[in-house]
A protein has these predicted regions:
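Catalytic core of non-heme Fe(II) oxygenases with the double-stranded beta-helix
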Residues: 122-195, 228-233
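Catalytic core of Fe(II)/2-oxoglutarate
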Residues: 177-242
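Short edge beta-strand segments in beta-sheet-rich domains
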Residues: 26, 116, 213-217
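Short, solvent-exposed loop/turn segments at secondary-structure junctions
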Residues: 36, 151, 164-165, 202-204, ...
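Active-site region of the double-stranded beta-helix
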Residues: 85-118, 125-141, 148-155
């Protein structure tokens, strides 16, 4: 792409054409994977049921004003379940795609192995207000979402520019509705079966949910660990017990 210089056919004296180059880009993979949807919804029902009970029990110990609000603004968050045998096919699929994502990005994984550090399901409260403020997952290499229940009426993920220098010096955009090189955030409107994979360093958030229709998704984080480290015994087990 040629940039700069004069927009007229006749080039003025001293005209220079610049060629555009693009570096330090942030990749986001989006695909539809409906083949796991039915079984995964059924599998995660029990995890959401348990998460609802845990949250209900927790609210019993909260101040009265929190009890009165109830679950508004909260979400039902499960424990990690990547080792559940019934999730095996989905976990393997996500692991393989995450490896391909890093490989495609240019990283040499010959001496690394990938490990799930977190793999959980969550559902926003049916009373509405469920959301995530902007955050990133520290010390992770791949993060992702798999959407189980969602619609045009539910929350959605928003991704933010991960470059601090860019954010600190941001200028006004000519068109806020158009994605350009100056865009500081983008969002996706998923549908059931949508899968999104992105670098673990990318800040993201979830828009406030209205509580009109169910919103449930799986979220995972993966770390690439040097093979020499992952094969060693944990140093924690070698330390003298107090």
């Amino acid at each position: 792409m040629i940039q700069g210089g004069s927009s007229t056919a006749q080039k003025p004296k001293g005209h220079v054409d610049f060629k555009s180059a693009f570096y330090f880009q942030t990749p986001v993979w989006v695909a539809e994977a409906p083949m796991f949807l039915k079984d995964t919804i059924k599998l995660t029902d029990k995890y959401i049921k348990k998460a609802k009970k845990n949250l209900k029990d927790k609210l019993k110990n909260e101040p009265k004003w929190k009890k009165d609000i109830g679950t508004f603004g909260l979400s039902y968050h499960s424990e990690s379940f990547s080792n559940d045998p019934k999730a095996k096919d989905l976990v393997q699929f996500i692991g393989q795609r995450s490896y391909e994502f890093l490989d495609w990005s240019g990283f040499n994984l010959k001496d690394h192995s990938l490990h799930f550090t977190e793999f959980w399901v969550q559902e926003f409260s049916e009373k509405g207000g469920g959301h995530h403020s902007t955050h990133a997952h520290w010390n992770q290499h791949v993060s992702g979402f798999y959407f189980l229940k969602c619609s045009e009426k539910t929350s959605f993920p928003i991704f933010h520019d991960p470059r601090p220098g860019s954010i600190m010096t941001k200028l006004p955009l000519k068109n806020q509705e158009q994605i350009s090189m100056g865009t500081s955030q983008v969002h996706y409107k998923p549908k059931p079966g949508t899968m999104i994979i992105f670098p673990g360093y990318v800040p993201h958030e979830y828009a406030v949910d209205a509580g009109i229709e169910p919103f449930r998704f799986i979220h995972w984080n993966i770390k690439a660990v040097e093979t020499s480290i992952s094969k060693e015994r944990s140093l924690k087990n070698e330390l003298p017990k107090k």
